[in-house]
């Protein structure tokens, strides 16, 4: 089943016509402020595969209609195999710490620790996050957000917002809006950690909201 889902996702990058096959249907488009690229990390099948082998761009889009065509054509969040990821980043930015646009930044993250807690709502949370990011309503005009990530893991399912820097005054606004977008309660916390700190074992988050 995992291989089937991974194959379905990979096939989207082979031919954009698998998503859009009607010029008439998508003739009237509502452009987004930025162009976005969807990436997919497939689960590792052998130890010789590294991160770069597993991370693949799927498709780039620039309108509301294109977004919905893609979203409705790929496996939903709760059907992704373990150790896979979705990444939605502004065009030209790879979802890697080493990318110049990400190297001085970090990520806001919300984690689910129990699988039973995730499945009924993860699709809804992921969609809310996607819409906030492509609509650029989760940030002010500083162009602070680079992308959004969904990680599927055995012990934790995570939704994360990647930022271009670690300016705390800007970060708090993004974190507060993320909580609002995901409709989290006061007991459900989002945490920010810089990418540099994430490389340090046992590092604590810099901000918790």
UniProtKB/Swiss-Prot annotation:
Binding of mRNA, residues: 51-52, 97-98, 153-158
SUPFAM superfamilies in UniProt: eIF4e-like
One GO-annotated biological process of the protein: regulation of cell cycle
UniProt superkingdom: Eukaryota
Cited InterPro entries: TIF_eIF4e-like, TIF_eIF_4E, TIF_eIF_4E_CS
GO cellular component terms listed in the entry, alphabetical order: cytoplasmic stress granule; eukaryotic translation initiation factor 4F complex; nucleus
GO molecular function: mRNA cap binding; phosphatidylinositol-3-phosphate binding; RNA 7-methylguanosine cap binding; translation initiation factor activity
Keywords noted in UniProt: Initiation factor, Protein biosynthesis, RNA-binding, Translation regulation
Subunit-structure text: eIF4F is a multi-subunit complex, the composition of which varies with external and internal environmental conditions. It is composed of at least eIF4A, eIF4E and eIF4G. eIF4E is also known to interact with other partners.
Free-text function comment from the UniProt entry: Recognizes and binds the 7-methylguanosine-containing mRNA cap during an early step in the initiation of protein synthesis and facilitates ribosome binding by inducing the unwinding of the mRNAs secondary structures.
Record PANTHER family: EUKARYOTIC TRANSLATION INITIATION FACTOR 4E RELATED, EUKARYOTIC TRANSLATION INITIATION FACTOR 4E1-RELATED
Protein name per its UniProtKB record: Eukaryotic translation initiation factor 4E
Taxonomic path: Eukaryota, Fungi, Dikarya, Ascomycota, Saccharomycotina
């Amino acid at each position: 089943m995992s291989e089937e889902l991974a194959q379905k996702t990979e096939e989207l990058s082979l031919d954009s016509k698998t998503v859009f096959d009607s010029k008439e249907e998508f003739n009237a488009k509502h452009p987004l402020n930025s162009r976005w690229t969807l990436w997919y990390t497939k689960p590792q099948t052998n130890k010789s595969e590294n991160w770069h082998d597993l991370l693949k761009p799927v498709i780039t889009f620039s309108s509301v209609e294109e977004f919905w065509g893609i979203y409705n054509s790929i496996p939903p969040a709760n059907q992704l195999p373990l150790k896979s990821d979705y990444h939605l980043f502004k065009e030209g930015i790879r979802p890697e710490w080493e990318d110049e646009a990400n190297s001085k930044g970090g990520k806001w993250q919300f984690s689910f620790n129990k699988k039973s807690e995730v499945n009924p709502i993860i699709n809804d949370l992921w969609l809310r996050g996607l819409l906030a990011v492509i609509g650029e309503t989760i940030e002010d005009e500083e162009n602070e957000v680079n992308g959004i990530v969904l990680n599927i893991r055995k012990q934790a399912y995570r939704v994360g917002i990647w930022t271009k820097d670690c300016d705390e005054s800007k970060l708090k606004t993004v974190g507060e809006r993320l909580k609002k977008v995901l409709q989290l309660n006061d007991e459900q916390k989002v945490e920010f950690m810089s990418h540099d700190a994430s490389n340090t074992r046992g590092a604590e988050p810099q901000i918790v909201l």
